[in-house]
């Protein structure tokens, strides 16, 4: 009996890459193998030399089609099997392997906004705004919550696919939600987040709504959408000195701007110093401070071990870039401090 393999890849659209996918029918017992596509239609090639390679890197059950069908996450390669310039996973893998002994873990909080056409769900039809922020975060009841059907269906799909999804919640703005992926390693966390994003788009299709990962989906006195990224190493999970070393390393000379440059498009619109953010061009860290660039949870200070939360990444970030940057910066500093 044949089965369907949905090949998923990240395209070359700038400033924010899009997800693409197509279906291949495979014979029973056959493993997903390399495939090709027209890179000139995905901003990854010119028309006169348009072939690009899909290299499978992770296969999971397909919760949309069910049965023996699968989702196949792929890296994009050139026809000589080198990493394509849009392939950010290859550099991520190199850093992950270099610091594997430190056992980096990530938990990524992916925020997003559901739209009906040009209107965020929960905003009045015909224009105008809902009541001010306050009752929507982790809210319940039809006056506060919209889109839960999509959110629950997506959660179930991620679980059925075997992804390391760890929770969901309604966010501060109407129509805005969050799901969390992790704990998982440097590359695994990003792999699982990209598949979870694809599933979210796919589930939303069936409900006739669209998903926005825009950093500031509604201008004005409304929260932006981020991808707060929690990080730890073995040393951080065992002692507080390593927590401080990691937090300090992210503010070292040149590091704040290097990181925000890789944290998604529209960073200046979201990181204003308002709405639970720190200014994009300043670095700070503090205990229980959601107005800092990096937050140390209060329980971490009490326990004298745990993790840090980088609050700067946008919802539209490339998680391969985010986990690579944090792993490289923090693990290098911890290695130099002999805190491994």
Give the location of each predicted region.
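Glycine-rich, acidic/polar active-site loops that bind/position phosphate-bearing ligands
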Residues: 1-340
């Amino acid at each position: 009996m044949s089965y369907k393999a949905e090949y998923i890849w990240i395209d070359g659209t700038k400033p924010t890459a899009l997800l693409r996918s197509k279906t291949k029918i495979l014979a029973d017992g056959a493993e997903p193998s390399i495939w090709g596509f027209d890179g000139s239609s995905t901003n990854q090639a010119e028309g006169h030399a348009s072939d690009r390679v899909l290299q499978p890197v992770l296969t999971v059950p397909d919760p949309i089609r069910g049965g023996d069908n699968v989702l196949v996450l792929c890296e994009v390669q050139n026809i000589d099997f080198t990493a394509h310039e849009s392939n950010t996973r290859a550099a991520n893998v190199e850093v992950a392997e270099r610091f594997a002994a430190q056992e980096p873990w990530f938990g990524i909080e992916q925020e997003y906004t559901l739209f009906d056409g040009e209107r965020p769900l929960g905003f009045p039809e015909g224009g105008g705004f809902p009541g001010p922020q306050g009752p929507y975060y982790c809210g319940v009841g039809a006056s506060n919550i919209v889109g839960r059907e999509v959110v629950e269906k997506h959660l179930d799909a991620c679980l059925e696919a075997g992804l390391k999804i760890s929770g969901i919640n309604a966010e501060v703005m109407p129509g805005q939600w969050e799901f969390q992926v992790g704990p998982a390693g440097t590359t695994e966390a990003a792999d699982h987040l990209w598949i979870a994003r694809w599933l979210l788009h796919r589930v939303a299709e069936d409900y006739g709504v669209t998903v926005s990962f825009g950093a500031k989906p509604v201008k004005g006195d409304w929260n932006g959408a981020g991808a707060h990224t929690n990080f730890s190493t073995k040393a951080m999970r065992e002692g507080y000195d390593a927590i401080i070393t990691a937090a300090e390393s992210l503010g070292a000379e040149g590091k704040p701007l290097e990181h925000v440059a890789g944290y998604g498009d529209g960073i200046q619109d979201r990181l204003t110093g308002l709405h639970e953010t720190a200014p994009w061009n300043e670095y700070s860290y503090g205990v229980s401070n959601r107005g800092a660039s990096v937050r140390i949870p209060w329980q971490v200070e009490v326990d004298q071990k745990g993790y840090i939360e980088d609050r700067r990444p946008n919802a539209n970030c490339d998680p391969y870039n985010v986990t690579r940057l944090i792993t490289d910066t923090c693990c290098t500093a911890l290695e130099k401090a002999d805190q491994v």
